[in-house]
């Protein structure tokens, strides 16, 4: 196995950037999900998991690192992330602030994604609050653990583009590798170049992969196929449709496109 592609998302729920290499520290991918939009009314982190309010974020793109992170709006305007509050509030129809500080216990709204598929993106559904970054130290706005991986075996089975699942690392698997093989990697050290990761959870899937991503149309199969073929127990969350794998960083360092991937 080897690394097929590497991805970083400087602003949570926006499209990100494809890179030749990533640097990892014990908090995850440096520069990943360092910014997020916060709903000024409720103080909740904006995420397209709640498509009724936030799906337009997936029409925006973010790139860069540190204070140089830039946001490209759907109309083509490019803005510094730290000064994009006004234009993003206008786009979303809700007042937001762009933040680099993840509050303790920060939460997002997460309606049941299968109900979203059944009843529509604008349906007024119950939206339980989910605390983010429960498996991540530091202040990045990741969903759970520091790093997210998915294999080409799983992507080929589902039949969607990798970017819909928003992984950091896409792993090429040999011909004949079963889909959802990531389930079998839990608890086994994962070595990528000089970096060691420890898998923590299968990745539960939400509404995000089914939504429009930039110019890409909706893709309901990105949820339906995992729901049909890979409902698994996710510790602390129940039995959920999953695709991919979360991991924590045991040994930090750089990883590069083409690096070998080994399972302990």
Task: Kindly label every feature range from the protein language model.
Residues 1-264:
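Metal-cofactor-dependent catalytic cores
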